[in-house]
Amino acid sequence: MLKKSTNIKKGSIIFFEHTSKILKGNLLGDPHIRTFPVYIPWQYHSARNKNRKFPVLFDLAGFTGSGLGRVNWKNFEESVPERIDRLIHQQKLKPFIIVFPDCFTSLGGNQYINSSAIGRYADYLTLELIPHIDSELRSLASREHRGCLGKSSGGYGALIHGMKYTKFWGAIGSHSGDAYFDFVY
């Protein structure tokens, strides 16, 4: 088991339940009410930061993964929130909010695109979740302070969003993004 640092300030995970108009009635019959976690850095709740706004990063899970899975405990490595806490503590990162969207489908996931067969997940992220986060949290609500990253299918989604939805994203990261999904849909 990985020995984890206990002497650093930790952020918190809050859960949002969002009712999507865009995902309602999708052909797969997947839920349109989604619960997803959001990482909040400890500085967000600090009294001296009560008016401070924070950049936001959307973390897109890979195929068969979910936003909920991205915040889980890991036995031999740091979870995403643990890693972010450590890097903020070491001053290698500045504090920011991380959104872990729930875009899981009955097929095991998606590529965060709009699909007549699976659902309009690009629109769900850009037209519903971004405004929801910006209205509920003290976020820096502009593309210059918003990023999107992912691994595998999430990496593909991040690349597509970086190319097709540039008015929403100021930074993109893709780790092993799969490709050729546009030929499948």
Predicted ranges, named:
Residues M1-Y185:
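Non-catalytic cap/lid and distal C-terminal segments of serine-dependent acyl enzymes
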